[in-house]
A protein has these predicted regions:
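Short, internal strand/loop/helix patches
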Residues: 762-796
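Short Pro-Gly-centered beta-turn/loop motif in secreted/extracellular proteins
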Residues: 309-325, 329-332, 340-341, 625-651, ...
């Protein structure tokens, strides 16, 4: 209990000051908020003021006061009723218990509900004990599922029963904060050793931060499947919305959000320094420097800082390759520079800013090869559960999984049924509206929101074909914004004269928006979108939010509109074609690409194109474009571009190549893509894999250390009668003579003897000879081995090649053409 203590005594004056500053920016909105604060207790009002003082403008525009009231009331309740919470340093309580936002998720009131669900399970526990217990509760309510980029609210993850790692961690952080455990989400923004990223959770107890995998409970802290992976990261970061930073190395700001470097808790690190010179060779003060890793065949930022008065900037990072780009506006133009360095052997580098272009400074139309080396596996967190803890954890996780599977068995969104079943005579269009939404949208959409969009779109149904009307007029979704009502609000903002004028000249919608809606990037988080109705409510919105408002206004007026899927430029339909709102985004040039036949080209897997804009390269979104007969023609805006190609090797390293070019208005540039092949020795790893046991046919067990003790072996965990497994078995049978020589070194692992009766596996065993057959239930081992070898354990077959006892040199999972040839090369 917090008897005798004054709530937020140390920060009260600061909160009041920051709240008043926020008020001054949006006085018309805060007048209503102040009325509602007057109805709250002093403690709850102060908690609300803290939330409003440090939330992005988008939150103020998107959500009602009552949403934040839940977070404030629960925070005050915990402070009053939980002595551990009351004793927390105020900056820890404010940022990591009270605050409503975790990252870029939708916000929905959830804290009081979660506390009532979890409270009895954690009563009387320390923060450490409560964190472990809450994670078991999270596992029983949600699990991993690959979804689109829109981040669900914590409550939606709970109701849906699954989410991607960023959503699982948002859910887990909210659950932990709901019972007073200080918690935050941390991110490896991009891995260096594979094309992906990952988010997990840190909790604060005993004066330090500890980590856990969201919805992936363990019996101890500082353990997760990503322990080894995080030791190969070049960056792990957290974020804080407050302007008073509790601790840590600042690695950049995203509007009002400060990014903090947490890598030292996970990996071996060192400090590197970059010196930036201007075009005259003098120190470039205030230059923006982006530290990047090559991931999904594009340079992805992991930290963004500005140089000091000496033109220098420093960063603590991992031991591997990092790409550095810098930009600065000077003498009426943007200057740019790039370089790469291997931090394992280099401590510093120097780059010189120059204009970009054929007639200016930086320019070269030739392929340049670059090797990007991933940090080696060197985990700094080595705690392991005891055998007893491991057994208890397995049992509890099985119970959580069983509970969740029962919960989601017949799960559906009642709001969808409510919308579909309303008897109004437009049932076919109701169905089409739901169909145009994403699968994720259908799990958390609200009937009233859909009703509003249907009502105001239907008058335009007969004026165009359904394949235009449904996706580009009726469709309530534009990008990754929160789905809300906005059509009535938009129409109320416009006079009849304005409606008629904008329908005749849709491009003027953007002028209307520019006149009415301002951008305040220092008060926003770039990835948190202000909804169309939120923009109108506050009169503010980021550039992307305003683009979404353009599409929303056009659709409300019956004009088919979209954001171009390649570059998010605004477009509306005229004479059956989408045309750009801005002449600057007109596709007035093109590129003709020729690809080699021996490489399967896939965008964001082994190639990408980026356009230079304001001194910074932005990657085009071309996932839907494919080569035909090894050729592709793409419309482009005139300007400077960079093509990247990459060959990700099994050991995590990348053989990359860059090609810079400029294309003029009306020009078609011809480029032949270059792909770098690797030698066998470049592809191999030396990874120690943990001991495990497999079953023989008679029920006895054999240790993996014994199986792999003598020379090279192939361990293949097979999923019989599934195409990826069938494919590798067929490849092996096509070269049966070669594989038969190594039959005694090949180990097939299946779930049961019944698998041996399936046609393809049975035929393969007959052709290949004395292949060893062992058994496992696939419940744990494949997950551990897949993660350890840095391949996807959810994709079978899982194939590992060892060269000595418990030492993996190569692994692959899922469907991969040519695996048979690779295995023979390795043997």
């Amino acid at each position: 209990m917090a008897e005798g203590k004054i709530f937020l005594k140390e920060n009260r004056d600061r909160i009041e000051k920051k709240y008043r500053e926020q008020m001054m920016g949006l006085p018309q909105v805060f007048a209503e908020i102040d009325k509602k604060l007057a109805e709250c207790t002093d403690e709850v009002a102060l908690a609300c003021k803290y939330l409003y003082a440090f939330m992005p403008y988008s939150d103020i525009g998107n959500y009602a006061f009552e949403v934040f009231l839940d977070y404030a009331e629960n925070g005050v309740y915990l402070w009053k009723e939980n002595s551990g919470v009351a004793e927390l340093p105020e900056e820890i309580f404010l940022n990591y218990v009270l605050f409503h936002r975790v990252n870029e998720e939708e916000i929905a009131p959830c804290r009081t509900f979660f506390r009532r669900e979890i409270g009895e399970r954690t009563e009387g526990m320390s923060f450490r004990e409560a964190a472990l217990e809450v994670n078991y509760w999270c596992a029983q309510e949600a699990t991993y599922h690959c979804t689109d980029d829109r981040t669900l609210s914590a409550l939606a993850v709970y109701r849906r029963g699954n989410g991607r790692c960023g959503e699982e961690s948002v859910f887990t952080v909210n659950a932990l904060r709901s019972v007073g455990v200080p918690a935050r989400q941390v991110y490896a923004p991009k891995w260096s050793h594979c094309d992906d990223n990952h988010a997990w959770v840190e909790i604060w107890c005993d004066g330090s931060w500890y980590f856990l995998g969201a919805c992936e409970p363990e019996e101890i802290l500082n353990k997760g499947w990503f322990t080894n992976a995080s030791s190969r990261a070049m960056m792990v970061h957290s974020r804080v919305f407050d302007t008073m930073i509790p601790e840590g190395e600042v690695i950049g700001k995203d509007g009002m959000v400060t990014m903090l470097n947490e890598l030292k808790r996970y990996a071996l690190t060192k400090e590197i320094t970059v010196s930036v010179k201007d075009s005259h060779g003098k120190p470039a003060e205030g230059a923006e420097v982006s530290f990047e890793v090559l991931n999904y065949s594009e340079y992805a930022p992991i930290a963004e800082l500005k140089t000091d008065s000496l033109g220098k900037v420093s960063l603590t990072t991992g031991l591997g390759s990092i790409h550095i780009s810098a930009r600065m506006y000077a003498d009426g133009e943007w200057l740019h520079a790039e370089n790469s360095m291997d931090t394992k052997t280099e401590d510093c580098c120097e780059i010189c800013l120059m204009p970009v272009g054929k007639e200016k400074g930086i320019f070269y139309e030739e392929w340049t090869e670059i090797d990007m080396i991933a940090p080696h596996d060197a985990p700094v967190n080595k705690d392991m559960p005891t055998p007893e803890q491991k057994e208890r954890g397995s049992r509890r996780l099985a119970e959580a999984n069983a509970y969740r599977e029962q919960k989601v068995r017949n799960l559906s969104n009642p709001e969808c049924r409510k919308f579909l079943e309303k008897e109004t005579g437009d049932s076919s269009m109701r169905k089409k509206l739901l169909e145009v939404l994403t699968e994720k949208d259908r799990t958390d959409c609200i009937s009233q929101v859909l009703e509003e969009h249907l009502k105001f779109a239907l008058p335009y149904e007969k004026s165009m074909d359904a394949d235009i009307f449904v996706p580009y007029v009726l469709n309530p979704r534009v990008d990754d914004e929160v789905l809300q009502k906005y059509r009535k609000a938009i129409l109320e903002q416009l006079s009849e004269e304005e409606k008629n004028m904008l329908q005749k000249e849709p491009a003027k919608i953007w002028k209307w928006i520019e006149d009415k809606i301002i951008s305040s990037p220092e008060k926003e988080r770039s990835s948190v979108i202000t909804t169309p109705s939120g923009c109108l409510k506050t009169g503010t919105g980021s550039l992307l939010s305003k683009k979404i408002l353009f599409v929303a206004m056009a659709r409300t007026l019956g004009i088919p509109a979209r954001l171009n899927p390649h570059d998010r430029s605004m477009e509306y339909m005229k004479n059956g074609k989408f045309i750009p709102v801005s002449a600057e985004t007109e596709k007035n040039a093109s590129i003709f690409l020729k690809a080699s036949e021996d490489t399967q080209w896939k965008y964001f897997q082994n190639w990408s194109i980026a356009k230079l804009e304001a001194g910074k390269y932005s990657t085009l979104k071309l996932e839907t474009e494919n080569f035909r007969d090894q050729m592709m023609k793409l419309p482009l805006e005139a300007g400077n571009y960079r093509i990247l190609t990459s060959n990700r090797l099994p050991n995590g390293n990348i053989f990359a190549a860059e090609y810079y070019f400029e294309v003029q208005i009306g020009e078609m540039k011809r480029v032949e893509l270059a792909f770098r092949n690797a030698n066998l020795e470049d592809m191999l790893e030396n990874i120690s894999i943990p001991e495990f046991t497999l079953r023989k046919e008679d029920g006895s067990t054999v240790k993996a250390s014994e199986l792999t003790a003598d020379g090279k072996h192939i361990l293949a965990f097979l999923e019989e009668e599934k195409e990826p497994t069938e494919h590798i078995l067929n490849e092996m049978m096509e070269q049966e003579e070669a594989f038969s020589r190594y039959a005694k070194r090949i180990i097939f692992v299946v779930k049961s003897k019944k698998a041996l009766e399936t046609p393809t596996l049975s035929r393969a065993l007959g052709k290949l000879g004395n292949v060893q057959i062992l058994y496992d239930d696939f419940s744990e081992i494949i997950n551990i081995l897949g993660r350890r070898m840095y391949v996807d354990p959810d994709k079978l077959p899982l194939i590992i090649v060892t060269n000595k006892s418990l030492n993996g040199i190569y692994a692959t999972s899922g469907y991969n053409v040519g695996t048979g040839d690779m295995l023979l090369r390795l043997l």
